[in-house]
């Protein structure tokens, strides 16, 4: 495929933005080459500035569960735009979205709309510290909760793609309040609470981790977190910025039938607009300003256009439609497993709901150490081969892929055919 114009745009972008991008993973550093510059998107497809079309499994990193430019959402968004793009005041549209979220997640007795997943997670941590009067937080190695200083300790995802354990610019005093433990390790968790339990404000968890590749938590691990946080008076926060309304119709909390104290949402609830939320039990959330002394604010929080996009997206995402998207995910993943077996390729294919990923690994991947040990060079080669065939996957083995209602069976079969061609070529290369 020709990429002349993408390369030209990338040259210009590097004069303006660090690395030529406005989010690091878009730079394609983990897979080689230059990023694609996208001109438009519709349904399951991206169209780049060179006129190439790609079947898209990145879907803006998860939000576009109905596909790009969904016809059942855009008319309401256009109407909202003409009624005013930002009020800086409450509107009925934020109530409509909040009620729909609460209907699906009843334990979210109170919530606050914000503009990004990072804003949601950092605010939830502030609530936990304000409520408990404690300073330490527990996170898990490889889980990414945004780029707030407290979270950039063994954070996986973008940092891992660049071989960075922690970010420069995070002062030691802040990093020292974050206790980073191995994912899916109940013994390490128990030991941590025995040592620091009275100082721990909260445990924050990606119950379906999507930033060290797709790695679901063990049910026993989640149950242990819930019991220890209750025993020690710490809050349990589930970060569902990625998995919310993706891993299950009710997100990871629905998948595992657990009830955290606070939850963070994002991506899908904005329908492609910058929307996120944090919320949970009223006893905690009612301590947020203006009712309480835990401060959080945002000029564009509850933006009426973004609220409309989120509302219309969730309204369309019925249990029946979710099941259809989940079935498509299973169909594709079953096909990948069959192809890996056919070509004797050690591939661990993982899916939860409408999310999927895979690792070039001989054994199941349960934590960040397993993920790092997977063959990332093979993934980079595969990514390049698939891109040439018009298949757009997340450009890092540490990232997760997504399915939408817009993907057709023909799209899935074309994708599997491209995988087969790539596997065959990789096998021939390996055999010399």
Swiss-Prot record:
Cofactor: pyridoxal 5'-phosphate
A Gene Ontology cellular-component term: cytoplasm
Keyword annotations: Cytoplasm, Isomerase, Porphyrin biosynthesis, Pyridoxal phosphate
GO MF entries: glutamate-1-semialdehyde 2,1-aminomutase activity; pyridoxal phosphate binding; transaminase activity
Subcellular location(s) per record: Cytoplasm
Disulfide bond residue pairs: none
Pathways per UniProt: Porphyrin-containing compound metabolism; protoporphyrin-IX biosynthesis; 5-aminolevulinate from L-glutamyl-tRNA(Glu): step 2/2
Alphabetical GO biological process terms: protoporphyrinogen IX biosynthetic process
CDD domains given in the database record: OAT_like
Modified positions (N6-(pyridoxal phosphate)lysine) in chain numbering: 267
Reaction catalyzed: (S)-4-amino-5-oxopentanoate = 5-aminolevulinate
EC number: 5.4.3.8
Quaternary organization: Homodimer.
Classification via PANTHER family: GLUTAMATE-1-SEMIALDEHYDE 2,1-AMINOMUTASE, GLUTAMATE-1-SEMIALDEHYDE 2,1-AMINOMUTASE 1, CHLOROPLASTIC-RELATED
HAMAP family: HemL_aminotrans_3 (MF_00375)
Assigned protein family: Belongs to the class-III pyridoxal-phosphate-dependent aminotransferase family. HemL subfamily.
Name recorded for this polypeptide: Glutamate-1-semialdehyde 2,1-aminomutase
